Amino acid sequence: RNVQMVFQNPATSFNPKMKVRDIICEPLMNFGLIKKKEKDAIARKYLEMVELPGDFVDRYPHNMSGGQQQRVGIARAIALEPEIIFCDESTSALDVSVQKTILELLVKLQKEKQIALGFICHDLAMISSIAHQVAVMYMGNIVEILPGEKVTEEAMHPYTKALLQSVFDIHMDFSKPIEPLEGEVNGATGEQKGCPFQNRCAYCMKKCQEEKPELKTVGEKHELAC
């Protein structure tokens, strides 16, 4: 109940035979927090919070755009008044203009309701602009943790740097070719001794092949496993 989720593709996370009223109120009904006769008013309340008209309560998922569906998904997530909401690539399936409005809505709700938001995302530019803290993962391992506003300037791990170099920016030098990482990616299920990034790291040493680095503090709110 205290942890909720906003999925990447809301259309596949909704029951296509359920109206928005039931989609939003289903978690509340499951926990016995509201009565059936209260569903309409409750659904309208949360639709207003995500900036959708109240008459959307009678719509089915296929009657809405992708952005509208995602707003309903957010309404469902906040209905239980959780402490934290995880957003799994919650804007990647949307148009850029719609992405911006959804992110602005999430940030607004986070401030109003004092909830924590956890973004699972590959878009470093977006993450660095809104996240207070960023954890960079490689093959299921956290390799670096640092403040969002310092990602582009203070990243230290070779993988974090490689990610940043792969992001197109209008200020980048297009005369320089993008250098892909060398080496093979290990299978996610395979056991590997040492650093998980060793096969693709230009700075790999013998120690990297023998010992798995642990996260260590290297600066203010900055941890590195290298």
Predicted regions and their residues:
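Catalytic Walker B motif of ABC-type/P-loop ATPase nucleotide-binding domains
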Residues: I85-D88
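Conserved ABC ATPase signature
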Residues: Y60-M64, Q68
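Conserved ABC ATPase "signature" region
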Residues: E38-D55, L164-Q165
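P-loop NTP-binding/switch modules centered on Walker-like glycine-rich loops
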Residues: S90, L94, V98-K176
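Charged, flexible cofactor/metal-binding loops and thiol motifs
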Residues: L146-A225
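ABC-type ATPase nucleotide-binding domains, specifically the catalytic core motifs of the NBD
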Residues: M18-E38, E51, L146
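Conserved catalytic motifs of ABC-family nucleotide-binding domains
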Residues: E81
